[in-house]
Amino acid sequence: MIRISIGVNRRLRYQFSSFAGYSGSENPRLFKTLGAANTPIPHRRNPEPKGQDLDFVNVAHSHLIQSDWDKLNKLSDHLDSFRVKNVLLKIQKDYLLSLEFFNWAKTRNPGSHSLETHAIVLHTLTKNRKFKSAESILRDVLVNGGVDLPAKVFDALLYSYRECDSTPRVFDSLFKTFAHLKKFRNATDTFMQMKDYGFLPTVESCNAYMSSLLGQGRVDIALRFYREMRRCKISPNPYTLNMVMSGYCRSGKLDKGIELLQDMERLGFRATDVSYNTLIAGHCEKGLLSSALKLKNMMGKSGLQPNVVTFNTLIHGFCRAMKLQEASKVFGEMKAVNVAPNTVTYNTLINGYSQQGDHEMAFRFYEDMVCNGIQRDILTYNALIFGLCKQAKTRKAAQFVKELDKENLVPNSSTFSALIMGQCVRKNADRGFELYKSMIRSGCHPNEQTFNMLVSAFCRNEDFDGASQVLREMVRRSIPLDSRTVHQVCNGLKHQGKDQLVKKLLQEMEGKKFLQESFNN
């Protein structure tokens, strides 16, 4: 296959700057950026098929037109990339036939495909607005190809662009596919190269890129990219602006989020419930609950009704701040305006009251949940079990564990941790350790907090043998060890005259960065 290279410098980092303006359209000509500094689109002359190659192309074309796949199958052994390419060029006006032949050649003789054959079918599909099919082929190439292949795909499309009388949407599809695959460097390169040749991606593809960036926590880059979109006169849509609001909120720039909300009308858009919910969540995250309530009240003035997400966000904010009366008040308002609470609503309130130790209120919300036919999940029961175990009411907690079977729910790590905590509160460390073993047998994984609860419970009972057994489990599972806990266990063992056990325990901890000298006196 011909090795392709171009003289455009590849950007391996962002060069995004300030923003301005408008653009973006389905009309291919409007993908062109203004100005005359664009690099000309190159054109490569490809050799025409001759002799046996020409005969093959003509015969294959005839069989394709007549849908005579039996005869075509007999030609499959003679396929190569040059012949496949020229057949695809000959039938490119029929995208269905092109795709059918492309897939047939891939199945019958995979070695007959090259980047050039892929490029031609991609041009054909995008010209006919079959973007999902094009992106499916691109995804297959980019995921299953070699390490250096992504960098070559743009070049292959570029050098066949004029030959196929293509449209900029072929590069747009490449950019969007890189975005969906979270290949951010390749997406950046494609964006910068598109600009070099006078093309811009659609706002939908830009949204896909920003969404992937935000999904990976790359808020700073997403916001810089938005500024570059505006500088390139790519007009945002409401989905874009809601993502930018989310980015501002996640980076703590709440004032900028509010400014953008106010600017939406100037940009030709009405704020949506998503816009307000995003800002409400941002303010709740920062503990600015009064401001969050004001935003909820602003929704009505804007002709929007708070929905279940709005109320759930506020309830979660108040519960996290342990302002449970305010959370209950929001719940009451929610029901008053006929917004139906869901599983998330009840779970948040049940968990909040359980954390506070008010099991009666938690159980009241649980009963209301049952009466209203709201689906309970493992989080519902874990919250109730946690609240009961926190108060050492392990028998009542066990009743809810039995409820899990009736609801076809399986205990998870949080369920076992709560039950272990209950036994530790009751100073039943041995029973807690038995629950730990059941937890492991069930395939659940305890965390550092669970182990430390068990160690503390054994130490309170002055059962340092049991505590050392838990420490060994922690070492075996590479759970971080707290030096004060280790000192406490080892000193307890020494006071009981179990120096050999201390020595053995410290040997097992070798390499865990604990100083043994302090235990040798």
UniProtKB/Swiss-Prot annotation:
GO cellular component terms attached to this protein's record: mitochondrion
Classification via InterPro entries: Mito_RNA-Proc/Resp (IPR051240), Pentatricopeptide_rpt (IPR002885), TPR-like_helical_dom_sf (IPR011990)
PPR repeat ranges, renumbered to this chain: 167-201, 202-236, 237-271, 272-306, 307-341, 342-376, 377-411, 412-446, 447-481, 482-516
Annotated organelle transit peptide span: 1-38
Keywords, in A-Z order: Mitochondrion, Repeat, Transit peptide
Superkingdom of origin organism: Eukaryota
Predominant cellular place of this UniProt entry's protein: mitochondrion
Annotated localization: Mitochondrion
Pfam families tied to this protein: PPR_2 (PF13041)
Family from the record: Belongs to the PPR family. P subfamily.
Protein's UniProt name: Pentatricopeptide repeat-containing protein At4g26680, mitochondrial
Species in which this protein is naturally found: Arabidopsis thaliana (Mouse-ear cress)
